[in-house]
Amino acid sequence: MAMAKAGAPRVSAAQLVTLGLSLLCAVAGPAAAQNCGCQPNVCCSKFGYCGTTDEYCGDGCQSGPCRSGGGGSSGGGGANVASVVTGSFFNGIKSQAGSGCEGKNFYTRSAFLSAVKAYPGFAHGGSQVQGKREIAAFFAHATHETGHFCYISEINKSNAYCDPTKRQWPCAAGQKYYGRGPLQISWNYNYGPAGRAIGFDGLGDPGRVARDAVVAFKAALWFWMNSVHGVVPQGFGATTRAINGALECGGNNPAQMNARVGYYRQYCRQLGVDPGPNLTC
């Protein structure tokens, strides 16, 4: 259930030109940090950099105080998240979990909607159909990772998921960075920047993700917006590759991969949209 490290995003020539202009504007104050992990009051640009000018907070802004194009419930195209993720939809997922599951009283629609306000780019930036597909994809992966919101933390807690080579995000003594939350965020190099972006000590207190449902959803959405959101238009298979490609794609574990596809198809049907092409990886 551990989340795989996402690869570096590919940047086109046109993006490099725009990125260069954005970096020139850094003199005005923004501190560039690839793949974001920005402070709460700083925007994450469509190319994954932190800043506060229009180049960062304008068109394509992924998270933070976006000024245009992001739009949590309006603007920038896409789907109205609160209208799509109804109580019936959310609780319908939870109802599939057993009565003794710890997550049944932890994961709530209100916690998700509270968290998604911090990520106005989620389910936005394209058409309403594309927005609904992104919502279906997010919940398909969350369903697979948590067993219909049954599990809060990874079952096997023996692995510390500490990568000492990631010196920017040093592991704290006695802490383990195993999977927690809707997407089972794992590894010190994910907890560290997620905590910095959300506003908690991800390295010193990774357990916060398992104690606070809003933080849990924010951590999942942080990973999603930084590592998955950009590949959603490529098809559901690309989102699986971004989350757990090393373990499930390329024939490594077709049963697990196809289980994700099954949930995605189911949720697309519920939301009234075609799942689109390229569902497998």
From Swiss-Prot:
Q: Which subcellular locations apply to this protein? A: Secreted
Instruction: List keywords of the entry alphabetically.
Output: Carbohydrate metabolism, Chitin degradation, Chitin-binding, Disulfide bond, Glycoprotein, Glycosidase, Hydrolase, Plant defense, Polysaccharide degradation, Secreted, Signal
Q: Which Gene3D superfamilies match?
A: 1.10.530.10, Endochitinase, domain 2, Endochitinase-like
Primary location recorded for the protein, binned into one broad class: secreted
Instruction: Provide the residue span(s) of the region labelled Hinge region (Gly-rich).
Output: 69-78
Q: What's its top-level EC category?
A: hydrolase
GO MF annotation list: chitin binding; chitinase activity; endochitinase activity
- Any GO BP: polysaccharide catabolic process
Q: Name one GO cellular component term.
A: extracellular region
The catalytic residues are E145 (proton donor)
> Which InterPro entries does this one have?
Chitin-bd_1, Chitin-binding_1_CS, Endochitinase-like_sf, Glyco_hydro_19, Glyco_hydro_19_cat, Lysozyme-like_dom_sf
Is Transferase among this UniProt entry's keywords?
Answer: no
Q: Which cysteines share a disulfide bond?
A: C36-C44, C38-C50, C43-C57, C61-C66, C101-C150, C162-C171, C249-C281
Q: What else is known?
A: Maize chitinase B seems to be less active than chitinase A.
Please describe what this protein does.
Defense against chitin-containing fungal pathogens. Its action is countered by fungal polyglycine hydrolases, that cleaves within its hinge region (Gly-rich) to disrupt chitin-binding.
* Record-given protein name: Endochitinase B
Question: What organism is recorded for this protein?
Answer: Zea mays (Maize)
Q: What is the lineage of its organism?
A: Eukaryota, Viridiplantae, Streptophyta, Embryophyta, Tracheophyta
